[in-house]
Amino acid sequence: MKKIILSFALAGSITFAWAQQDPTAMKYAGIISPDLAKKHLSIIASDAYEGRETGKPGAEKAAHYIADEFKSLGLQPIVNGSYFFDVPLTENSLNATFAVGGKAFANGDSFYAVQPSTDRVLNTSEIVFVGYGTDAEIANTDLTGKIVLWINEDKAADGKPQGTSFRGSEARAAITKNLLSKNPAIILAANSEIAGVLTKYKNYILAPRLTIKKEDAKPADTKPAVFWITNEVAEELVKSGGKTYEQLKAGGGTAQTIKADVKISYNSVKKDVKAVDVLGFLPGSDPKLKDEVLVISAHYDHIGLLPEGTKGDRVNNGADDDGSGTTGIMTIARAFSKAKKDGHGPRRSILFLGNVGEEKGLLGSEYYTDHPVIPLANTIADLNIDMIGRVGYEYKDKADSANYVYVIGSGMLSTDLHNVGEKANKTYTNMVLDYKYDDPKDPNDFYHRSDHYNFAKHGVPIIFYFNGEHADYHGVGDEVSKINFPLLAKRAQLAFYTAWDLVNADNRPVVDGKKEEGSK
């Protein structure tokens, strides 16, 4: 379907080649320069900002830098006279112990716990092995209050394993839900890839989780916890049963009870965390249109520091992710602010939105869209910029590597918005607009992985600009020295031209697409 839509858009965009360029727009787009981008990014992605992790001093420092820039540009502070929009967060850390037959296993080395909602201590002399957890395997088996060992891998129709993917599948998600409905004490989900995942991502897995603090918090959910475990732990759990875990795995069949001395405990520790989105407002000049607002967003947070004791560089600078997008909205803000000072202000208003907590689960944008300063009904679109300073895997060493950008979501809710983006590109920037990831069902799931999604789920049309992942994604190699500043500036100019057309058009983009099922 997306290829059909793209072909139609390109066919319809033939007239864009003759669209008249607006010299006023081009004048102010020129403010978005490689030098200006480098000036900002060299500061916010420096080691002094310590990777800008949400809730840490580096992120707070970045928020103040952005606010100071907004103030210098004359943008209005619309949060009760402030540029800072408080995002109340809770830090959730977990203490967990796990022993089998007196042998202790360490959280993050042999298992990890999907954040439980309650605290528990479990002591048992037996477990229930449920194979792949199919209905046939657990039929007539009472799992209430039991420690359940489950092979968390896919099983083909012929009964043989067909994959171990850690990423999961719809079938396994359904099995998990079904097993949880049986009210076990805990589910121990064994997967062959867990050992490697824990080796690579231990620090991330053990890091405290941030969630939005709920003012009307409901009583804690009492559903059972799920621990992902390695095959080594699974072998220890079943060894008294006369068969190895691999033999049980190959055998399948019905659920069975196995003697095992198991001790498990876990408890959560919570504390409040201070975090802010940064909002700068440029009011529109048209009395009839100024109440309509275009949002231009980027997240300024990143993933912070590697643990103390790490050899070499500890700072995840996040120059591309998303220092580049943050730099983009600051340069675009400068261009629009200068236009307004010169008497060419936008007809509609613009909200420049620096989001916090994106790396923690799109938290800042979620809180903003649930508690908007400007009604979402008045928000005509969100142009979200996340990673625009590098060349991704698929364009590396290609002839057009310095003249492309991935565009995601532009036509999912509004054909008008898609066409405006196409027209801006054809008229001014002439980049390759790659729609490869423009699909909510794309296995990379990029549509749901940045802040635009929280607008889209409320029915606000969006465009997500993205350069694709690269070898330094979420690593210490994401440095300013590797940024292609002319490419960053050109991508930001594309967003500027698209915004220029949106805020000055007679009509806002018509929403003719449907929100995803389950969206608000």
Give names to the regions the model predicted.
Residues 22-25, 106-140, 216-318, 334, ...:
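Soluble metallo-hydrolase cores and metallopeptidase-like ectodomains found primarily
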Residues 327, 334, 466-520:
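His/Asp/Glu-rich mid-to-C-terminal helical/loop segments that flank catalytic regions of hydrolases
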Residues 107-217, 223, 283, 314-317, ...:
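Extracellular/luminal Protease-associated
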Residues 31-49, 54-77, 140, 146-170, ...:
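Catalytic-core environment of secreted peptidases
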Residues 23-31, 47-57, 72, 85-86, ...:
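Second-shell loop/turn segments in exported
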Residues 1-22:
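Bacterial Sec-dependent N-terminal signal peptides
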Residues 50-159, 420:
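Noncatalytic luminal/extracellular "stalk/propeptide" segments of secretory-pathway proteins
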Residues 106-107, 224-242, 355-462:
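Metal-dependent peptidase/peptidase-like ectodomains
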